[in-house]
């Protein structure tokens, strides 16, 4: 099997959803022009990260998959460019709201994954906006190979990566929106990368993470009950090999596209040779699900 070229897109997001979508489309086109067949955009790239504050009015941002403008536009782009393109959206399903990825493959909608783990603190108030996903972990059989998806906070849980590996993922993708947390007195960029590098190494499956970049501020107002917050999204998007080694990495504060090539057929053989999954003892792991 020929190698697959994977791209991770790192971009800043403004308050203009139309402008953000246009930028994302151009970056996808740029990646495809460099030969990328599987292109990963950041989490919720249509808008600035609205989860820094609580505003009931922001519920209106959620649209059904069919009504979402990014899905509509990027479906056409995916078909035109013959690429696999996961699209991160704020989804409305009747009266329930989710943080969702729509998997597009050469213009076809292969299905959705809804974020499993929903964070909740001052900077990431996602439980106010999203219901925990009900799809279960998903691996999509695409024209590039079997693609597993986790969304941002999912990437911190080893169970996510292990489930996706057990489902046959050739690569695990993590669209992300993460930045420095002032309460920590620093930032988590190194910890963030090492966590996913470990998932790759433990499962013999490469991972890719696409983060946003830029400073996003929330100013106090009556509508948000006078909340104030600032997140400095630290970029640092990356792609690893199956041992967790970073093959390509982005800077902290630039918009850029990074690339890596993979022979998924060879990696499947490598996983078999390691015997990692042959030697598992699921009957001994009950504590994990207690």
Regions found by a protein language model. Give the residues of each.
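Cys-nucleophile CN-hydrolase/nitrilase-fold catalytic domain and related Cys-dependent amidase chemistry
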Residues: 17, 26-112, 178-205, 215
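A conserved C-terminal secondary-structure "cap"
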Residues: 267-290
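N-terminal active-site segment of His-dependent metallophosphoesterases
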Residues: 1-38, 173
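Short, glycine-anchored, charge-dense loop/turn motifs used at functional sites
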Residues: 6, 103-110, 240-247
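Active-site catalytic loop in hydrolytic enzyme cores
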Residues: 63-66, 76, 92-198, 272-276
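CN hydrolase (nitrilase-like) catalytic-core segments centered on the catalytic cysteine
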Residues: 66-84, 152-256
């Amino acid at each position: 099997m020929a190698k697959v070229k994977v791209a991770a897109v790192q971009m800043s997001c403004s308050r203009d959803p139309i402008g953000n979508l246009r930028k994302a489309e151009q970056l996808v086109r740029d990646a495809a022009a460099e030969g990328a067949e599987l292109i990963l955009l950041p989490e919720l790239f249509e808008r600035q990260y609205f989860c820094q504050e609580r505003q009931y009015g922001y519920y209106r941002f959620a649209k059904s998959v069919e009504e979402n403008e990014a899905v509509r536009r990027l479906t056409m782009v995916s078909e035109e460019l013959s690429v696999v393109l996961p699209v991160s959206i704020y989804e409305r399903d009747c009266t329930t709201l989710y943080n969702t990825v729509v998997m597009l493959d050469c213009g076809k909608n292969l299905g959705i994954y809804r974020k499993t783990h929903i964070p909740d603190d001052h900077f990431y108030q996602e439980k106010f906006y999203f219901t925990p996903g009900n799809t279960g972990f998903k691996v999509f059989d695409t024209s590039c190979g079997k693609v597993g998806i986790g969304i941002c906070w999912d990437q911190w849980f080893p169970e996510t990566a292990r489930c996706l590996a057990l489902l046959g993922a050739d690569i695990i993708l993590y669209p992300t929106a993460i930045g420095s947390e002032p309460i920590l007195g620093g930032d988590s960029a190194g910890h963030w990368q090492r966590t996913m590098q470990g998932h790759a190494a433990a499962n013999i499956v490469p991972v890719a993470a696409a983060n946003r970049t830029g400073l996003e501020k929330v100013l106090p107002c009556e509508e948000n009950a006078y909340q104030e917050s600032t997140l400095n999204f630290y970029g640092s998007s990356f792609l690893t090999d199956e041992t967790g080694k970073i093959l390509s990495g982005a800077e902290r504060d630039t918009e850029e596209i990074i690339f890596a090539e993979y022979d998924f057929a060879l990696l499947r053989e490598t996983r078999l040779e390691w015997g990692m999954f042959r030697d598992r003892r699921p009957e001994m792991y009950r504590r994990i699900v207690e």
